[in-house]
A protein has these predicted regions:
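Terminal alpha-helical segments
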Residues: 1-133
Length: 133
């Protein structure tokens, strides 16, 4: 898949997660979502979208199965320190806190979406310039 298409695909994941989280029933009085199932789904979709974008800009050797988060952090550290910081925060927020724990806090979920967009934006910025032939 071309790099531009991977970035667009990553953004599509974020849009899908936005639709999913709407089903989590937000309680404005408590400032929480009421259904963790949709939080978990949205968090996992967000993180998957980030992985699509990261695969576009990071050179990671593929072995058996999916590369570990450590490989992504190592590759990002060599390429761009700001991307590394976003990956560390994003992994914790989207994959662990949202995706596994299903944290219902609106602030946590909003932070997950912000981090996903930050990672994808940074990957887009780091994409090599298209070669015009």
């Amino acid at each position: 898949m071309e790099i531009e298409n991977q970035i667009a695909e990553a953004r599509r994941y974020v849009a899908n997660a936005e639709e999913i989280i709407k089903k989590a029933n937000y309680d404005p009085e408590l400032k929480i979502y009421t259904d963790s199932k949709y939080i978990k789904t949205a968090g996992n979709i967000l993180w998957s979208g980030c992985l699509v974008a990261l695969d576009a800009v990071l050179d990671i050797r593929k072995g058996k199965g999916r590369p570990s988060i450590e490989k992504y952090k190592e590759a990002a550290g060599k390429r761009d320190r700001k991307l590394l910081a976003a990956i560390v925060a994003g992994y914790d927020t989207m994959h662990l806190v949202m995706g596994y724990d299903g944290n219902k806090s609106r602030k946590v979920c909003d932070a997950g979406f912000e981090l996903a967009n930050a990672i994808i934006d940074r990957c887009e910025m780091l994409c090599p310039e298209p070669v015009i032939v």
